[in-house]
Amino acid sequence: MYIAMNRFKIISGKEETFEKIWRSRDTHLENVPGFKKFNLIKGSEKENYRLYASHSLWETENDFINWTKSEAFREAHKGAGQHSDIYLGHPEFEGFEIILWSIFKIIWSFRPLYSVGGM
């Protein structure tokens, strides 16, 4: 498995604009071979920016590389430079091969707030 991350430094006060851009964009990832999962994560606030990262999970690094050469990638990044006023510098890419993988099982237990039928 492979994790691809882009780290973004978003100028303080521009966070809502950045999040709106991501919420409204089509990533074109749903049918890409090897794609598993995507998250946009928000980090800590610094003196003049907030850190964000796009975090995508891939079956292999090669699947990710193939996506970066695809039409789907070009479509997903179309117009990416239009909002340069919200960024403090260029995004920083980081790629990671997963060497240990652990899945934690979450068990939900609940009881009804009310019962029907006198129970």
What are these regions (language model features)?
Residues K14-F18, D63-N66:
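Short, conserved charged micro-motifs
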